[in-house]
Amino acid sequence: MKQKDMDAMQSFSKALMGPVLFLPIAGMLQAISSVMSNTALVTEGGVVWTLGKFINGGVSAVIGNLGILFCVGIAMSLAKKRKADAAFLALVSYLVWLAANARWLDVAGLTIAGDTASALYGTGQTICLGYHVTDMGVFLGMILGVVVALVHNRFIDTEFEGAMAMYGNSKFVFVVLLPIVLVMAVVASYVWPVAAAGINALTGVMASAGAFGVFLYGFLNRV
């Protein structure tokens, strides 16, 4: 593998560490709050139970929105300059993708009946931030984060003169990103269900293949 490819993979790995490092803290707080609200240990409706429910509700926002956290974290980490702009563009791009994908599923007649994430579990679609979208999970955040960072690094220094001056730099990056994100939202409606089926099939093979499954997992992990 070329050194350039190795450097790119190392940069991506480091970018992943930002959001990942917050997860143990969120998980620990969620575990503590679950114990505090366990009716086998405390009285339901009491102060401790109420506090546990309150903490659990707040911390669950971290666990339940990993996609957007990875999107912002990866884009900010991979940006070579003006990282705050990259983070903001990542957030906007994520919201645009959600809205565009939800609308495309609707107009294309691909929306599966269900009003909650639990009702849509296993269908390949979910409810994310109020939008009925293709369920890409954390992969959406990873992919969008990388795309935003690449476009940001390529066009962040673009400037114009005269009346167009206000549309340079991060604003021009958004202009470039918008059609890319819209196309990605449409393509995901058709491509991701197939990719997800492949991932599930591979998981099933590794789980049922015994020693070979362990070898395959180790091999892919090393690759």
Walk through the language-model features, giving the residues of each.
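Transmembrane alpha-helical segments of polytopic membrane transport and secretion proteins
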Residues: 1-3
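Alpha-helical transmembrane segments and their membrane-interface exit regions
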Residues: 145-150, 172, 200-207
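Aromatic-rich transmembrane-lumenal/periplasmic boundary elements in polytopic membrane proteins
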Residues: 185, 192-223
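Generic recognition of stable, solvent-exposed alpha-helical segments in well-folded globular domains
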Residues: 11, 23, 27, 69, ...
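Early transmembrane hairpin of solute transport permeases
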Residues: 5-168
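Hydrophobic alpha-helical membrane-associated segments
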Residues: 152, 179-191
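Short alpha-helical linear motifs
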Residues: 111-117, 186-188, 201-202
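Small-residue-rich segments of transmembrane alpha-helices in multi-pass membrane proteins
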Residues: 96, 171-180
